[in-house]
Amino acid sequence: MARWIPTKRQKYGVAIYNYNASQDVELSLQIGDTVHILEMYEGWYRGYALQNRSKKGIFPETYIHLKEATVEDGGQHETVIPGELPLVQELTNTLREWAVIWRKLYVNNKVTLFRQLQQMTYSLIEWRSQILSGTLPKDELAELKKKVTAKIDHGNRMLGLDLVVRDDNGNILDPDETSTVALFRAHEVASKRIEEKIQEEKSILQNLDLRGQAIFSTVHTYGLYVNFKNFVCNIGEDAELFIALYDPDQSTFISENYLIRWGSNGMPKEIEKLNNLQAVFTDLSSTDLIRPRISLVCQIVRVGRMELKEGKKHTCGLRRPFGVAVMDISDIVHGKVDDEEKQHFIPFQQIAMETYIRQRQLIMSPLITSHVIGENEPLTSVLNKVIAAKEVNHKGQGLWVSLKLLPGDLTQVQKNFSHLVDRSTAIARKMGFPEIILPGDVRNDIYVTLIHGEFDKGKKKTPKNVEVTMSVFDEEGNLLEKAIHPGAGYEGVSEYKSVVYYQVKQPCWYETVKVFIAIEEVTRCHIRFTFRHRSSQESRDKSERAFGVAFVKLMNADGTTLQDGRHDLVVYKGDNKKMEDAKYYLTLPGTKAELEEKELQASKNPSVFTPSKDSTKDSFQIATLICSTKLTQNVDLLGLLNWRSNSQNIKHNLKKLMEVDGGEIVKFLQDTLDALFNIMMEMSDNETYDFLVFDALVFIISLIGDIKFQHFNPVLETYIYKHFSATLAHVKLSKVLNFYVANAEDPSKTELLFAALKALKYLFRFIIQSRVLYLRFYGQSEDGDEFNDSIRQLFLAFNTLMDRPLEEAVKIKGAALKYLPSIINDVKLVFDPMELSVLFCKFIQSIPDNQLVRQKLNCMTKIVESSLFQQAECREVLLPLLTDQLSGQLDDHSTKPDHEASSQLLSNILEVLDRTDVGPTSAHVQLIMERLLRRINRTVIGMSRQSPHIGSFVACMIAVLRQMEDSHYSHYISTFKTRQDIIDFLMETFIMFKDLIGKNVYAKDWMVMNMTQNRVFLRAINQFAEVLTKSFMDQASFELQLWNNYFHLAVAFLTHESLQLETFSEAKRNKIVKKYGDMRKEIGFRIRDMWYNLGPHKIKFIPSMVGPILEVTLTPEVELRKATIPIFFDMMQCEFNLSGNGNFHMFENELITKLDQEVEGGRGDEQYKVLLEKLLLEHCRKHKYLANSGEAFAFLVSSLLENLLDYRTIIIHDESKENRMSCTVNVLNFYKDKKREDIYIRYLYKLRDLHRDCENYTEAAYTLLLHAELLQWSDKPCVPHLLQRDSYYVYTQQELKEKLYQEIISYFDKGKMWEKAIKLSKELAETYESKVFDYEGLGSLLKKRALFYENIIKAMRPQPEYFAVGYYGQGFPSFLRNKIFIYRGKEYERREDFSLRLLTQFPNAEKMTSTTPPGEDIKSSPKQYLQCFTVKPVMSLPPSYKDKPVPEQILNYYRANEVQQFSYSRPFRKGEKDPENEFATMWIERTTYRTAYTFPGILKWFEAKEISVEEISPLENAIETMELTNERVSNCVQQHAWDHSLSVHPLSMLLSGIVDPAVMGGFSNYEKAFFTEKYLQEHPEDQEKVELLKRLIALQIPLLTEGIRIHGEKLTEQLKPLHARLSSCFRELKEKVEKLYGVITLPPSMTERKPSRAGSMVLPYILSSTLRRLSVTSVASSVISTSSNSSDNASSRPGSDGSILEPLFERRASSGARVEDLPPKEDSENRISKFKRKDWNLSKSQVIAEKAPEPDVMSPGKKTQRPKSLQLVDSRLTPFHSPSPLQSTALSPPPLTPKATRTLSSPSLQTDGLTASVPPPPPPKSKPYESSQRNSAEIAPPLPVRRDSKAPPPPPPKARKSGILSSEPGSQ
């Protein structure tokens, strides 16, 4: 059978396609995933993706590209390491890590960072490909490596990832192979480098000067890249463009010219140069770049005829000035602008050609008028005036160029900017040397500038048109070909012709050309200038011959080169042939200076010189500048170099050498040094020369130390080791040096000695090399001791010098300390290292204490850096001295320790001791440990965390601890003399470690440094833990504080953020685990062991250690949790056994407190909850005494954790404030039950803040009230936990309670809960009045209370709606899951808005359309289902309002507040559907919800704890509907009767809807359904209810009669047709009803106003139950009979009209209570009715009639009378007296229901447009305008309005008529 074969070669690969697994055994892969392959089988591999090692699976072989890899630990635990270059691996890992972050940036919409990372990623991918290609040369690969690592480091910093530390070659440092100090320094360097890079990029973006300054400080040479794009100018002839850099402030050219030859066709003359005209101006130094202004100037010279308009017969080929173009490039050069792509336009300014100045020099710019520039003004002036001109009239003509500043010399520029600078790029050099002269830069450029001339016009009437021709000849008169270079970009020319100015007597040219001649030719060459007049007529021009000649020799007679500067040349005239004969004219003086000198000589000797008679009339001036590395213009230097031929001047020349320019000396460095040593050796008899040569040598060494010549250091080194050969120089040099040091007090020698000390390093190299050569030639001869003695003598002289008082020669002392160590490595070659070490020790000891401290420390640092310290035997000598000096510096009593220098010295010592190639170091580490460890610790403890040296000292401390072996630790402890010393040391160390762990010294991204610190600390902590166990464990020696510090340190270490692996990316996590393991486990297990070691001492750590141990157990590492959670049980057991109380309350309270803090701080998870409960239960159940209490505690903690985790999850992840509040309340209740007031109060304020943020002021007040309830009105002091978080400064409970009450009252006021505010203010007023006697406060409080009373009556207060919400499904959090909550809506919030708000909180929830309770399938579903519908609050009126006439505004409050019961009605059909009358089978299901708490409360919602469901029959529904209709009519009639100003429209609509059969359809549905014989036979029990329904129909007629009457009174012209229609319909209706159901007449008082108290409106209100009684009660005075012969006239006494309403007052007032005389069988109906009626939105204007009870009905001793009955007489209802119980029982009405709490005044009626939560309307369908949900005052009948629109209340009535039915209009 085939089987899977382990792979051997195929170990590592990359997925090249996406692979989606179709089975569990398969492994899904994405392109780019790397896989470790374990086995293979028939085209399949088995293995895992390196991104997720836990999931193994199979995948197709063809999907994988195999790569080379090495396998480590072969077998089951093998790991693969890719075989790629380390850099490629790093690139790959970086790209993988960045890719994850890149996606997150996109998701989080961080566009800028996303784009930056995208660009960086693309760069890295491209570079990775280049490296993998393997085609790069070694140097390019090294360069690319630098770019890659810089980019990675910058990207990591940008993304907040860890800093990668590297060696000099860019390889990642391995912390195991690197010393701690080197690691620290590498971090510093990397951090600084990245910071500089970021700053540079920022300044580029901000165009700041910073960038330039940063570059200038590091780079010394620059190039300016110019790309010439186009030249737009209509010349019509060829032109030459000379582009150069110019300093307008100095009026000097900085660079040579870049020449472009432009054709007459508007293209370059050489067509191949099209689009390829570019140049680099090199050698610019930082001093050039910081010039205030730099311009790029272009001079355009026309090559053609004298004037443009001239014809063919005129002379052509003349070079004529045409114009200039100038651009200020200061911003580009200063680094403010850097965009090589941007094209700059340089406007061109042409020379004016006006005829009236033809006789003058041409003017360069049309903007500069002729009288501004004089005719002989030089070009620099013209340029400067052009630069000064602000506007340019360029007419679109000019040059287009792009520019870029390139850092580096020419070689660097060509290398770094190869995309810009190639072989075709012209190189224009600076006219002068760069800031740094490179030894290999051979240059021999002679710049010649034609300045001006003056030429006699001779026989001509006008000045000549002079052309100067310049060429180079040797002394034989041979022309040097192509020696003259007019500009870069073209080869040289043999002749250079100047520009011709037209008829100018004194032409100024300012044309510069470069002459390039081989060095060996220079001595033989001269430059010749020929002058010729050029005619504009070709024929005449041909006949013109040169009229003059001038020349200049390049070498002076003394061998020096022609001096820089201006030279006036002699112009010779005469025979052309003679003038062209070099042998002839070279015998004549070339310059005026030579001429004058020869004339002077001639005056002495007349026969010597006879110049031409014409030679002095014309003048010609040039300027020269020589940039040569081989020619000197210095006569003194030349004299020294040729000292043998001029030996008498040696002393003079040696002295003069100090004045020679450095540039001249370095050119001839080797020759100069040879001359010096030759003089020293050959003139050895004369000691004077020794000193002069020594000083000259010092001068040259100092010169090369200058930054300008720093690159000549290698040249000097090469000279010393390759060319220097003076074997006895060491004798003379050391003798002079000794003399200088010994005579340091001589002021004349001070400067010389100081210079010698600065040059000491190279002086000694000469001395030692001389000695080495001597020994090589002569062997160790007798003078061996002489040399050694001279070295000893030198040190002795230095020691004497250092011991002198500080004021003297402080500069010399400092220099000695600074430069003396630099000789060590050289001296060691020829001098005994041990003795040298001793000499240096004595040298250091010779310096008095507290003098030159820093210099001394720096000197010792350099000694340590030398190779001397790397020799073990030398270290034995030096280290004790170094540690003593450091000990003195770090001593506690040291006044001003130099921390910087000390840390530098200490770091260097430790770095050397960490090396493996320096011999044995153990004893040296021990020495440092003994003498310095505690000093270092104390320095760290005492140093500010902001100190720049803290990092360095901590690194030193880590280094010492890291280098200590186990034996060192035990030895160190043994060095302490007393036990107290050990305690002090351990205390210091523990405190310091904890402080360093708590406040990171190193940046977070210094991951390697931080992990190194952690690893070293861990080992040290464990070492010291052993000391604790051994020395401080038993009863006698136990140190509580020490152990306590140990535990706190260990916990701080374990919980340190750098060790929390789960917070890191997978890549980082794997990296850390692989390198360091999980250190938390190691320290955690040690904590556990140390705890169990404590034995009986444990009780001392309870409860203080509960918090720290909890932190340990909360670490999300399962093994660690399992190991440490049992410590809790141990603590419980310990307290139980040892506290003496037989409980573990201390532990319990502490655990609850700390658990709350930790979970809120983000620690803990579901797994922890389960594990904690499980482990505690396991241990407790095994314990004899803790079984019960322990088990209870385990469940308690588990419950607390559940609440806390829910709370935290919601707080962190859920933006819903409601969910946050729910969780807060759950936690709150838990702590309330546990009587943990401290935490309870904390969460109260969290809840208060949440409410305040949501503007739930009422709920915020109720929340604060819970805090206030914990306080007493007493002078007891406030314990700290009672004080609130944002505490008032109070001392007693009474003060705090008062402050809280004031805050609560203000919240109630904001929430319009004035009733509650009044209640609290009464309590507070009592305190003010009778306890604290604060009358001022009382007055203020009473004013507020008065305002609250006024607000209740007058202010508008919208009633909130209530909603039932069911959360079904397992997708909801546990505190919501499968529960129903009642929500109190916000002001004016409708159900639709509320639903939307809910769905926003739960975007994944599905909204249920049905209001029926869902089934189990939905409840157990993993989804979220939301059910939401409106419920009606059931009013619960306080007993104090019973039997009292309460104003409507007061009652309104109780309709929606202080409620706990809510109802919801849902219509449904029962039985067979009747197609003719659907109403007959329409039942109502009424659900009642009772909440856990009363509304409003501390939340805007509470859970429904009780739910009951009842059904209401169609008949009862009909009765309710009829009652509601009658109520509506009654209320509307009352309102209109009471307030005539009300709009008549609502009344019109109401009446129209009832009386118009076209609208309503009459009562036929009821008649068909209930008034049939068949129904009564089937439902005999409904007889009474049917009769009641008939009477309700009958009762409607008198109400409608009153309504029609009022409608008639308030009639407008528009409404007359409507009123006529209403009257007609009503007559028909009335006739029908009275005929079928009898007549009821209302008493006249029903429609009268009653007088009320001023300021309030008391509106008598008739309930439907009252109206019902009107239809059945037989009361003589209750009916106005139309019959004159009424039988019981006598009983109609005054006041008896109230008897009808007497039972009403009592029953309304106790609307929520059961009326005691109701028949028992009616209770259920009453309850059903109550819920049903509450579903209607009740009026806000209901009040209770103000009426004194009749004595016979309401007297105290009597029971409430039942309503009396009515009897039918002649189809009319006639009242009669009958107290008969039979009658009253037979005709007693249905039970009184809480319809008593309802009113239906027109502004708020909501009977139409019913939702599913309310019963349907009466059978006839209403029209749109029937809706009674409208404003009674303002809205016309046809327009429906929003249900919640409210009219402001009218002013109170002036007077009140007596009446029964009336209502306050519009009151809301």
From Swiss-Prot:
GO MF annotation: an example: GTPase activator activity
InterPro entries: ARM-type_fold (IPR016024), C2_DOCK-type_domain (IPR027007), C2_domain_sf (IPR035892), DHR2_DOCK5 (IPR030717), DOCK (IPR026791), DOCK1_5_SH3 (IPR047025), DOCK_C_lobe_A (IPR043161), DOCK_C_lobe_C (IPR043162)
Keyword Cytoplasm carried by entry: yes
Every DOCKER domain range: 1231-1642
Protein name: Dedicator of cytokinesis protein 5
Residues covered by region (Disordered): 1681-1730, 1742-1868
Bias type Polar residues, positions: 1796-1810
C2 DOCK-type domain: residues covered: 443-627
Originating species: Mus musculus
Biological process, per Gene Ontology: bone remodeling; cell migration; negative regulation of vascular associated smooth muscle contraction; podosome assembly; positive regulation of epithelial cell migration; positive regulation of substrate adhesion-dependent cell spreading; positive regulation of vascular associated smooth muscle cell migration; Rac protein signal transduction
Modified residues (N6-acetyllysine): K818
Residues bearing the modification Phosphoserine: S365, S1755, S1765, S1771, S1784, S1788, S1832, S1867
Biased composition (Basic and acidic residues): 1704-1728
Gene behind the chain: Dock5
